[in-house]
A protein has these predicted regions:
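C-terminal nucleotide
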Residues: 1-120, 132-183
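Glycine-rich active-site/cofactor-binding loop and its immediate structural neighborhood
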Residues: 128
Length: 183
């Protein structure tokens, strides 16, 4: 993806050999940390920090540069470099706002790395949720055993993102909650 200054997004497919794409998919592991976070608070702090700190702005630019670098590696078949770049990116992302990581997340991350992960990151704004790791297949059992977190099966979708209809409108849930609190 390329995010343009006018708010538009340019999507360009990542062209990879099918066997390399399959290897990448096999080596990605996702775990649910069980922790919740406020994405809006983290993103608000991050936005302020980027305005007020040249270092944080440089770190974000480096993250963008790493993504472009990774694209070239993946298209060239160097799939295992994904782990290294995920790691470097995560180290940079942690500097952008105080709530992006916490001691519990740091402990999970360090444990996975010691058990054989080549790199990883917390998905989303930070603070909790899902950890994604790039782990060679022969080390996945050790990572799984060390983390003891619910593992979420991961499979690439070649169709792109899609909206899933749940059947409950957010405002309906809010109104039900308000009725319960009033009673």
């Amino acid at each position: 993806y390329t995010f343009n200054k006018d708010g538009s997004v340019f999507v360009e497919p990542l062209m990879m050999e099918p066997e390399k794409l399959e290897l990448m998919e096999q080596n990605l592991m996702m775990f649910y940390t069980g922790t919740m976070h406020s994405a809006s608070e983290i993103l608000a702090e991050q936005g302020q920090n980027l305005k007020n700190s040249k270092t944080k702005e440089e770190n974000q630019l480096k993250m963008c540069s790493l993504a472009k670098e990774l694209r070239g590696y993946l298209q060239g078949g160097k799939v295992d470099l994904l782990g290294e770049i995920l790691h470097e990116n995560w180290m940079l992302k942690r500097t952008l706002a105080s709530g992006i990581s916490n001691p519990e997340i740091d402990e999970y991350y360090e444990s996975a790395m010691k058990a054989g992960a080549l790199g990883g990151k917390l998905l989303g704004a930070g603070g909790g949720g899902f950890l994604l790791f790039y782990v060679p297949e022969n080390r996945q059992g050790q990572v799984r055993d060390k983390l003891r977190l619910p593992e979420i099966p991961l499979q690439f979708d070649k169709q792109g993102s899609a909206l899933i209809y749940v059947g409950i409108k957010p405002h309906t849930v809010r109104k039900e909650r308000e009725r319960t609190e009033i009673s």
